[in-house]
Each structure stands twice: as C-alpha cells, then as structure tokens.
C-alpha cells in the first residue's frame, strides 16, 4: 500500500481538525470556533487588533444564520487563509 502524499495527509489533518472541534454534532458553534482559532490559529489571532474578530468570522461563515459553522464553511475559512498566505508569500518571500 502506498503512503499518502503530503497533500493527502494535509487534507486528512484538516478533516480531523474540523471533527475534533465540531464533535458529533457535525458543526461548530461560536465557542467551538473560538477554541479552534485559539488552538490552531493563535498567531493569526494574536495579530488581530479587533476584539470582535471571532464574531466577524462566525458571521461570515454562518451561511444559514443558525450560529453554526458547517464543514463547507470551515473549508472556506481554510481556503481564505491559504489565499492570504499565498499572496503574502508571492509579495514578500518569493522575491528573496
């Protein structure tokens, strides 16, 4: 059996991370999202000056306005952060 590629391993890690914070209910509420951000994106939060950052992220991700972040919305969060990181990389790091 072939070992998973690095990208496949990363995808599995993102999937497992979502379920770690969502639990059996298969979505994250605001508290779950806060725990995820504190645990997995602490550097990102540290650089935010707005105390409402988590509430704004929750509002952006909560498509149905039920106070829930589903897996699709979580993927949107990850994709948005990856895009921002890529833009930074292209602008600052790649030029070195």
UniProtKB/Swiss-Prot annotation:
Pfam families assigned to the protein according to its UniProt record, in alphabetical order: S_100 (PF01023)
Any one Gene Ontology molecular-function term assigned to this protein's record: calcium-dependent protein binding
Gene Ontology CC terms, in alphabetical order: cytoplasm; extracellular space
Stored Gene3D superfamilies: EF-hand
SUPFAM superfamilies: EF-hand
Region called Ancestral calcium site, residue ranges: 62-73
Function: Because p10 induces the dimerization of annexin II (p36), it may function as a regulator of protein phosphorylation in that the p36 monomer is the preferred target (in vitro) of tyrosine-specific kinase.
Subunit structure: Tetramer of 2 light chains (p10) and 2 heavy chains (annexin II).
Additional detail: Does not appear to bind calcium. Contains 2 ancestral calcium site related to EF-hand domains that have lost their ability to bind calcium.
Name of the featured protein: Protein S100-A10
Organism: Xenopus laevis (African clawed frog)
């Amino acid at each position: 059996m072939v070992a998973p590629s690095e990208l496949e391993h990363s995808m599995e890690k993102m999937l497992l991370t979502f379920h770690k914070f969502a639990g059996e209910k298969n979505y994250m509420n605001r508290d779950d999202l806060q725990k995820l951000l504190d645990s997995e994106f602490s550097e990102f939060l540290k650089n935010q000056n707005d105390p409402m950052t988590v509430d704004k992220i929750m509002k952006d991700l909560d498509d149905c306005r039920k106070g829930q972040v589903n897996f699709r919305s979580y993927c949107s969060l990850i994709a948005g952060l990856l895009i921002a990181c890529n833009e930074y990389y292209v602008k600052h790091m790649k030029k070195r």
